[in-house]
């Protein structure tokens, strides 16, 4: 198994749902990054882990990979039951809204 394949397996195994309570300490240290639904969360995590800076910079420039705004953070705090799909790529915590039935095949 190549290093890339091993990374993919490790990240897949650690990816899962989280609530605001779990995200809160990471929000406090400004480590949470929102991955837009049009990007596969796993592919974004791999790009960060493998330091694909040009690719990630493009996502940042397009707004598909960004920090949550103050308004989003406040809204999230009020939505205690809400869940996101999350994967940790130190020092970042990447989050994405769970896929809906219509786009479940494009997730991960």
Residue spans for each PLM region:
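Short, compact, well-ordered microdomains
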Residues: 67-108
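Acidic-enriched, low-complexity/disordered segments with a strong bias for Aspartate over Glutamate
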Residues: 28-30, 51, 57, 97, ...
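N-terminal, charge-rich interaction modules
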Residues: 1-50
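Short, hydrophobic/π-rich interface segment
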Residues: 43-76
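Generic secondary-structure microfeatures
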Residues: 37-39, 60-64, 91-93
């Amino acid at each position: 198994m190549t290093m890339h394949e091993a990374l993919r397996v490790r990240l897949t195994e650690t990816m899962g749902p989280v609530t605001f309570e779990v995200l809160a300490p990471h929000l406090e240290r400004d480590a949470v990054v929102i991955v837009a639904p049009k990007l596969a969360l796993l592919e974004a995590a791999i790009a960060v882990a493998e330091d694909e800076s040009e690719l990630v910079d493009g996502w940042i420039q397009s707004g598909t990979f960004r920090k949550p705004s103050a308004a989003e953070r406040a809204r999230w705090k009020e939505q205690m039951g809400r869940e996101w799909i999350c994967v940790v790529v130190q020092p970042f915590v990447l989050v994405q809204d769970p896929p809906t039935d219509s786009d479940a095949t494009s997730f991960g």
